């Protein structure tokens, strides 16, 4: 640290762009959504441990899924609204890594919300529901890593602490390995896997939506992390922007 002498009578304020009503609520609302997905993750993990189907806990999960997704939606909308009238932030959406970090859990949460309704009412998509529940929280932790570690170049980068990034990355990998390892062990043991449905139906539409949202999430993930992988392999430096997305 450098000593300032004489000490100023008043400290320097925040960057004027950050002194905004939208920024008071934008980050907390996002993290409330992330934390809400932790409850769904815990419920699904408990069901896997005790060999219960997703349908048995679907009613209990529904409120938490809706709660998490709504808070995440409001947080993203507030951030986009703020970026729109602040010069230099790329309009409503810039496809910045930090923006994508909140978009991926939002997409998975939307898929989980629809899949959960089908599981609760018709007993279908039990595996989809469990998988999306685990992925939504895993990507929430990954999103926190993107924001707080400074691993990816971003106009939203608020910290460059490698230690914090390593801890978050370790949490992400531990949760992912344990949860999805248990999911793989339980796969095929649930009777819901034998439930049939007409493809041209509401369930068929939900299945198509699940596939599209999964593709959107994977595409966003690749576009976000490919530059970091490219640089880590010493292949040079590239930038993936809005034309890709």
Residue spans for each PLM region:
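Polytopic transmembrane helical bundles with strong interfacial aromatic enrichment
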Residues: 1-245
């Amino acid at each position: 640290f450098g000593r300032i002498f004489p000490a100023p009578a008043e400290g320097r304020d925040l960057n004027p762009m950050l002194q905004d009503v939208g920024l008071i609520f934008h980050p907390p609302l996002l993290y409330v959504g992330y934390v809400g997905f932790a409850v769904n993750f815990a419920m699904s993990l408990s069901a896997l441990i005790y060999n219960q189907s997703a349908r048995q806990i679907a009613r209990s999960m529904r409120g938490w899924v809706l709660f998490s997704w709504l808070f995440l939606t409001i947080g993203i909308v507030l951030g986009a609204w703020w970026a729109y009238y602040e010069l230099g932030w790329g309009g409503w959406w810039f496809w910045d890594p930090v923006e994508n970090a909140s978009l991926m859990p939002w997409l998975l949460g939307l898929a989980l919300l629809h899949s959960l309704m089908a599981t609760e009412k018709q007993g279908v998509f039990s595996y989809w529901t469990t998988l999306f529940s685990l992925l939504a929280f895993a990507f929430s932790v990954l999103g926190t890593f993107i924001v707080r570690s400074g691993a990816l170049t971003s106009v939203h980068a608020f910290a460059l602490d490698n230690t914090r990034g390593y801890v978050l990355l370790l949490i992400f990998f531990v949760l992912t390995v344990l949860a999805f390892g248990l999911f793989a062990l339980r796969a095929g043991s649930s009777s819901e896997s034998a439930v049939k449905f007409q493809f041209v139906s509401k369930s068929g539409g939900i299945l198509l939506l699940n596939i599209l949202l999964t593709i959107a999430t994977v595409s966003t993930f690749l576009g976000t992390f490919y530059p970091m992988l490219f640089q880590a392999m010493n292949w040079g430096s590239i930038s993936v922007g809005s034309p890709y997305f």
